[in-house]
UniProtKB/Swiss-Prot annotation:
The lineage of its organism: Bacteria, Bacillati, Bacillota, Clostridia, Thermoanaerobacterales. InterPro entries: Exonuc_VII_S (IPR003761), Exonuc_VII_ssu_sf (IPR037004). GO terms for molecular function: exodeoxyribonuclease VII activity. This is Exodeoxyribonuclease 7 small subunit. One of its GO terms (cellular component) is cytosol. Heterooligomer composed of large and small subunits. The gene is xseB. It comes from Carboxydothermus hydrogenoformans (strain ATCC BAA-161 / DSM 6008 / Z-2901). Bidirectionally degrades single-stranded DNA into large acid-insoluble oligonucleotides, which are then degraded further into small acid-soluble oligonucleotides. It is found in: Cytoplasm. It comes from the Bacteria.
Amino acid sequence: MTFEEAMNRLNEIVERLERGNVGLEESLALFEEGLKLHRFCSEKLKELELKLVEVQEDEAGEVTFEEIVEMEDDLPF
C-alpha cells in the first residue's frame, strides 16, 4: 500500500465515522483500521524525513533542518 492509498482510505474512514450512520461493531472495526493506517502513514513520513536529513547533510557532516521544519507545517494532519 502506498502512502497516498493509506491516506485516502483513512479519509474515507473518518468521513464514515463522522456521518455516524454505522453500527457500534463496524465503528470499532473502522476505528482499529484507522489506527493501523495512521501508524503506517506516520512511519512513512518518518522514513521520508530521515531521507531528507541524509540528502541535506553537507560535506562537513552538518545537517540543516530548515526544510524539514517548513515541510512539517504543511502536513494535512
